[in-house]
Amino acid sequence: PAPTFTDKMQSETRMTSTSTAHVPTTSGSRYLQQLSKHWSHNLDVQFTEKHSRIIFPKDARGANWSADAVVTMEAQPETLDVTIEASSPEHLEALKGTVARHVDRFAFREAPLTFDWG
């Protein structure tokens, strides 16, 4: 059976690697919504104009991570704040690249954007 929302929430408690980037842009809400709609075709996505939460399954695209990862995005007036919670440092690094590439696709007029992961 497919994992339930509770299963997904419990898997989040096992995550060990987190990073946040404050990406300079005044179009954060637009990019957040476009990317959320794009990912909602294949991933569990919840979003509003200002907030998005995307769950990347541990076995997405043939991967074998120890737990699901969660990407949250918050649209601020001058930044798009992106946080990744992953199961390992390697998982985190892989998702940093995935997220940056996808945001840059929707932000093509001002890409590449600066992701100051910290």
Residue spans for each PLM region:
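Terminal, regulation- and interaction-focused segments at domain boundaries
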Residues: 10-31
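Structural preference for solvent-exposed beta-strand-turn elements
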Residues: 15, 19, 49-52, 76, ...
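Beta-strand elements of well-folded, non-transmembrane domains
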Residues: 25-27, 58-62, 86-88
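Amphipathic alpha-helical segments
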Residues: 28-41
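Ser/Thr-rich, low-complexity intrinsically disordered terminal regions
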Residues: 41-65
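Beta-strand/loop substructures that line and gate deep hydrophobic ligand-binding cavities in soluble
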Residues: 62-86
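C-terminal structural segments of small proteins and small subunits
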Residues: 83-117
